[in-house]
Amino acid sequence: MSKLVQAISDAVQAGQNQDWAKLGTSIVGIVENGVGILGKLFGF
């Protein structure tokens, strides 16, 4: 769960700094961690 929070924080900071490459990778991290958490919840 802390990885998801960190990915969201990174995305917000990248957006504020207009670092579009980091913003893109942070969004991928958010999706990746979110899917991982859902997988654990549903037993995948």
From Swiss-Prot:
Q: Where in the cell is it found?
A: Secreted
An example Gene Ontology CC term for this record: extracellular region
Q: Which InterPro entries match?
A: PSMbeta
Q: Write out the entry's keywords from A to Z.
A: Antibiotic, Antimicrobial, Cytolysis, Hemolysis, Secreted, Toxin, Virulence
Molecular-function GO terms, alphabetical: toxin activity
Q: Which Pfam families match?
A: PSMbeta
Q: Name one GO biological process term.
A: killing of cells of another organism
Q: What role does it play?
A: Has hemolytic activity and also inhibits the growth of gonococci.
In which family does this protein belong, per the annotation?
Belongs to the staphylococcal hemolytic protein family.
- The name on file for this protein is Antibacterial protein 3 homolog
Q: What is the lineage of its organism?
A: Bacteria, Bacillati, Bacillota, Bacilli, Bacillales
